[in-house]
Amino acid sequence: MADGTPFARRAGTIRHNGFVHAAAMSFDLHVPESRSLKAKRAAIRPIVDGLRHRFRVSVAETDHHDQWQRAEIAVAIVAESDGRVQTLLDGVERFVAAAPAIELLGTETAWLESE
C-alpha cells in the first residue's frame, strides 16, 4: 500500500450481524514437580505452544512469573460466531486440563461484548 502497511488490504474486524465474537479465558495452574523457574517454564512451554498451534489462539503467561510452582496463562479467541468461540474455549480447556505436568486449579472466562 502507499502508506507502507503491507496488511492494509486485509485489515478489519471479524463481524457477524454487527457483533464481534470474542472471549478470553485464564487458567490458574500448579506445577507440582517444579523446583525452579526454569523447570516451571519447561512444563508450561508445551502447553502454550500447543495451544497456539492446535487452536490458533493468542496465549501468554500472565501471572506468577516469579513463583516456581504456580503459573497463570490466558487465551484470547476471536471467531465468526459465539458458537465457534465456545467450541474453541471448550477444546482449549480440555487441552490444558489434560497436560501431564500441571494441575488445573481454576479457570475464568470473560466474553467481549461489542457492537
Describe the predicted segments one by one.
Residues 6, 55-62, 103-110:
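Short beta-strand elements
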Residues 28, 62-64, 91:
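A general secondary-structure boundary signal
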